[in-house]
Every structure is written in C-alpha cells, then in structure tokens.
Regions:
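Bacterial lipoprotein signal-peptidase II cleavage site
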Residues: 16-31
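Short, well-ordered beta-strand elements
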Residues: 42-54, 72-78, 145-146
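Short helix-initiation/N-cap motifs at beta->coil->alpha
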Residues: 76-87, 175-202
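Alpha-to-beta junction loops
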Residues: 90-100, 144, 167, 188-191, ...
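Ligand-binding "clamshell"
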Residues: 107-119, 134, 206, 211, ...
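A conserved helix-loop-strand patch within extracytoplasmic ligand-binding domains
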Residues: 119-168, 270
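A bilobed periplasmic-binding-protein/Venus flytrap-type ligand-binding module shared by bacterial periplasmic
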Residues: 126-137, 241-254
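Periplasmic-binding protein-like
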Residues: 154-163, 264-284
Length: 285
C-alpha cells in the first residue's frame, strides 16, 4: 500500500512540474481594424435648377460632372414656358433657374412681385429673322406679316432687330421698352403679329417671316446661318440680353449658387456651346 501511495504521489508531482514548465500562452493578438482603400465619399448635396429645354438644360447637363466634383448632385427640371420657372423658384421649389435675360427678369419681378436676382451671365443667343412664306427680307410684300414674341422685353428686342433691317422705325429714344404701339414708321404697312415665343417657329408657314428667340430656333432645328438677319454680336443687345443664372433674393452667396455659377462659366461649358450650337449660342463670360 505504501508503495502504491508513493507511486501516486510521484506521478502527481511530475504532472505538477510539467504544468509549471509549460510556456505562458502568448497574449492574443488584437486584429487591426480593416482599412479601405479610400474614405467613403461624402454624400452629394442635391441642387435643383429649372431651365428651358434648349439650350439651357443641355448646357446644365454638360456640366454635371463639374458639379459632382464640387459635391453637388444636379437635377435639371425642364420647362417649356417663361413663367413657371420663375414662379417655381419664388415658391422655393427650385434652387435656381437658367433660361432668361436680365430685362425679362426685372420686368417679371416688377409685374409679379417676385424677389429673384441674377448672379452671373452665362450665354447670349442672337435673335434671328427666319423665313416663312418669303425667303428674302426685301421681297416681303406690301401688307406682309411678321411674327414676333408677345412678352415685353423680347417684343422690344424683336422690334429693334426689325428696325435695324429697315423694315420699321420706332419712336425717338424708344429701345428696350418698345411695343408695337411705338412703331413710328411702317413703310410696307406690315402686320406685326404678337405670338407666344414658344409658338413662333410653328407660325412660319402662316407669316412671311418671324423673329425667333435663339433657344426656340435651336429647338425647332433652325440654323443661325440660315436666318435672313441676326443681331450683331457686338450690339448692345448681345450684352443686355445675355442669359443669366437666377436665384431667390438672399441666396446669392450660397455655396451651391457659387458652385453652379462656376460650372456654368467653366471652360467645359464654353467648349460645349461652341461645338454644339455653331454660333447659335455664344458664351457671355
């Protein structure tokens, strides 16, 4: 029995020493946090801009990448008239709009009580006189008809172009406020038809000629080179009627406004205008 006990004690002691002799377990390594190649991109800020279909919406779409690089996701809302883009901006449904020139904007603010401001010139679209039933201005007959835009500032612009071509003469000192009532001389007794701007191209089959806004001429597939006459690029009209980026008063210095203006006045925008429109749209910056 004593011998058995001794053997057991010997085994226990041997096991104890073996356990003590085992190396301490190495501390568990803490896994390093996984890293990605680059930080997740910041979420783009949505910016909503109202525009005429051509060329404004097309120009905006051409600079989407410029805005994306600046942190903005551009949404272009297309309009086919000259009223809704301003009322939508006034009501806060848009962040900006791009379709009009300053005289039209000022006239709209005065008549509608809106609070919209221009923040920069983008481009100029020369008005053109396009052939309808008559293919030459000198051939327009006595009592012939010419269609012009029916909104205030664009009507004046059309009348100034007709005057520059010797078809009518306006009253003394009447320029950008001219209406058909300000025609002082009309040698051929022409019938001047006031038509909604968007419908002018469609009216060509019914009149001898029409004075058409640049964007609607482009939209109708009319080429500047085919116009019977256009505004001179160095004329006061070219400067006065440059199309502008517009925001609601108080938002002129918003970061989104600055980013929009920078994109629309970029080399990308200018190159797009030159290549796409072949003289029908001219950068104004």
């Amino acid at each position: 029995m004593k011998k058995l006990i001794a053997i057991v004690l010997t085994l226990v002691l041997a096991l104890s020493f073996a356990a003590c002799a085992q190396p301490e377990a190495a501390p568990a390594e803490t896994a390093a946090p996984e890293t990605t190649e680059s930080a997740a991109p910041a979420e783009l800020v949505k910016v909503k801009v109202g525009a005429s279909v051509t060329p404004h919406a097309e120009i905006l779409n051409a600079v989407k990448d410029e805005l994306k690089a600046a942190g903005y996701d551009l949404e272009v809302v297309e309009f086919t008239d000259y009223v809704l883009p301003n009322t939508a901006l006034e009501q806060g449904d848009l962040d900006a709009n791009y379709f009009q020139h300053t005289p039209y904007l000022e006239n709209f603010n005065e008549k509608k009580g809106t609070h919209l401001v221009a923040v920069g010139k983008i481009h100029y679209e020369p008005f053109g006189i396009y052939a309808g039933k008559t293919s030459d201005l000198s051939a327009i007959p006595e009592g012939g008809s010419i269609a012009i835009p029916n909104d205030g500032t664009n009507e004046a612009r059309a009348l100034l172009l007709l005057e520059a071509q010797g078809l009518i003469k306006l009253k003394e000192d009447i320029t950008f406020t001219a209406t058909v009532l300000d025609i002082a001389e009309n040698p051929k007794n022409l019938s001047i038809k006031e038509i909604e701007a968007a419908q002018l191209a469609r009216s060509l089959q019914d009149v001898d000629a029409a004075v058409i806004n640049g964007n609607y001429a482009i939209q109708a597939g009319l080429k500047v080179k085919d116009a019977l006459a256009i505004e001179d690029k160095d004329s006061i009209a070219a400067d006065t009627y440059a199309n502008v980026l517009v925001v609601k008063e108080g938002h002129e210095n918003d970061e989104a406004t600055k980013a929009l203006l920078a994109a629309l006045q970029s080399d990308t925008a200018k190159k797009f205008m030159e290549e796409k429109y072949e003289g029908a749209v001219i950068a104004a910056f």
